[in-house]
Amino acid sequence: MNRKILFSIIFTILGLAAFQISISHIIGSSQNFTLFELLGPTGGMFLGPILGAISAFFVKALNVIILRQPLDFLTIIRFLPTMLAAVYFGLKQKKTAIIFPICIILFLLNPIGRQAWMYSLIWLIPFVASFGKKRLILNSLGATFTAHAVGSVIFLYSFGLTPAIWISLIPVVFIERGFFTIGIWTSCLVFNTILDRLTDFKAIHFLKPLVNQNCLVSTKFFKSFA
């Protein structure tokens, strides 16, 4: 079996388990952020941007099916934030920064968004961070803000909320995305290290090429890639 397909299956199973663990409530919604928000984007590094996004899609879709929720257009389009976060995390090119100006423009084109224009300025932070993607912490920050920017635009056009609520969320975003940045950074480092150790066993040694050698705990990592 192709190593990436096998790893995709493993990742999907782990993702479904992570999806069952809630970590915070999504303001303005009846849903919660789950542990998968921290694990989901890392699939882009191990599987590549496309397969990482597909794996994130399957995790979300299977979770909806298992919970017998309606799999309608709005539900599917809300898969995009995590999928694009995986794409961002998996791509090395700085061109991924384009997602943030696009989201800012889409946010400001909305009448409610224009009244809460300062909310969209938050995305200038990950835009700048995109030019330092070699660093895992900056790549993690960009990935979680990719999910945030895309998710916010979808939420704005789907549910609205008042300008006052959007503005009041600004300090919450900094705390929330700071936590998610550290969470993605930690998840990636731990997952990569465990995979590196497990692939020392002959039975799964063929998965070794999926290990990111730059993201293993070492002096070199903290000096150049952390």
Regions picked out by a protein language model, each given a short descriptive name:
Residues 1-226:
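Loop-helix junctions at membrane interfaces
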